């Protein structure tokens, strides 16, 4: 059957990348189709039931600032909230939400089903319709043809997915779901640069069989933080504890004894696993000097006894899993509800993508999520939103948009993937961003919501809330600049009495806030401020970090000069005099779009960038005189 409706955007896959891609395109007014193999698994958390964390929550806030769904779903489904790095600087603080899987998934589905311009269809995609070098649509498993101006692929771990438990293996996209074999084969036929990666998940445990009395409880923070700029604590369901226990030497001996049947250590698995989320087999091998590792027992939801034992991801045979779980303190009688497993899947070298996440080889075809070599819900969601918005803009022949490294962690993510490529699952960290003081979790809305509004991603309700917040920040900052404390006036005396600090000369309330040991709460009490905590936090960070932020702005200004120098798509690196063969090959492989991107390619020296710049200028001069 040839479906009669022609779509602007078709999104294949209903995971974290796919849902954000479909929602972004539909919010922008494009006729959008979301194809999923199972409507019941839309927004499914395939592994850890948590959103956020170091570096990751910055991405979640950026998705939220652009009108995305992930943060709001985390607020509606979160059963424990914590601020990580709370004693460190604002740049590296991160919010983490332990989520109820069912509530999170329900929140995502509700948003999808109520989004205008979005159709959902349950059917696996088996083929892409490609005419010449342009994608024209999709053919489903039943042979239904859907035509579209653009297609976004967000296939997660489903492309050629193989599940491993010990030396036994089976085809699967995740436990209980079939893989995408036909689509994987079709993509290989298109000569896209394919590789294999691996990820894994731990066995799930029945909480009724666990002795929590010998474990350390880990409560959430109070007052509870929120994930979304539009969120509120009233959205949160009941809050619960997680628990901490540890592996021991007996556990490690059991694991070592099973390595001869490990698919990772017998060469059965060829794909590379995530460096920053290693299996328990990897941990005892790589950190052999450690006699124990932490295990976090995390509830999967409020209406289930299922626990996620974070820290013991494994693909060992089930009998070894059984023994290793029962060797851990408090889990001596543990019942395993689901075995742990590893999954191996196809991914495509992200260096074959444009910065818009469109493939260089096929016009109108976009990739997002694990297909690009990343790991994590947050990284997937960020790519999905960018791919969705750019597919939407291409469909209407509008200029596409991707944030720069100084604008967003999304920009860092995309630039890293396309400039550097990846041979292992890529995870975001704050350390990957040069301008992290400017790219904080708390100011994602200030960086991106205005842009999102211009792109058509931000609705009237979110825009009004953002404008109201920024007006409150401006009003309160101005008020504090005009309130003065002096050694002999009432406000000055109250300040000294409250804080025990010295006050030798007249200062504005803003100047008092600049002091390292003074926080906004104290200034609010001193001056009778009634603004929200969010507004107060913005003012405090802006005041305390003003000097550092100004210096980063100067660094960005220097970088922009390189960013503004575009390298023509057909630029011939072979004619650049003085370039080494090695650097020439690297530049030809990556095909950087700007001098700034060229400068970030490993092994490309500043002198080489200078040579490229000189050649570009010579070429431009030649064209002008021709």
UniProtKB/Swiss-Prot annotation:
Record keywords: Cytoplasm, FAD, Flavoprotein, NAD, tRNA processing
Source organism (scientific name): Acinetobacter baumannii (strain SDF)
The keyword Transmembrane is annotated on this UniProt entry: no
Similarity remark: Belongs to the MnmG family.
NCBIfam families reported in the protein's UniProt record: mnmG_gidA
InterPro entries: FAD/NAD-bd_sf, GIDA_C_N, MnmG, MnmG-rel, MnmG-rel_CS, MnmG_C, MnmG_C_subdom, MnmG_C_subdom_sf
Annotated binding of NAD(+), by residue: 273-287
Location(s) in or outside the cell: Cytoplasm
GO annotation (BP), single: tRNA methylation
The protein's name: tRNA uridine 5-carboxymethylaminomethyl modification enzyme MnmG
UniProt gene name: mnmG
Segment forming the signal sequence: none
Binding-site residues, FAD: 13-18
Primary residence: cytoplasm
Domain of life: Bacteria
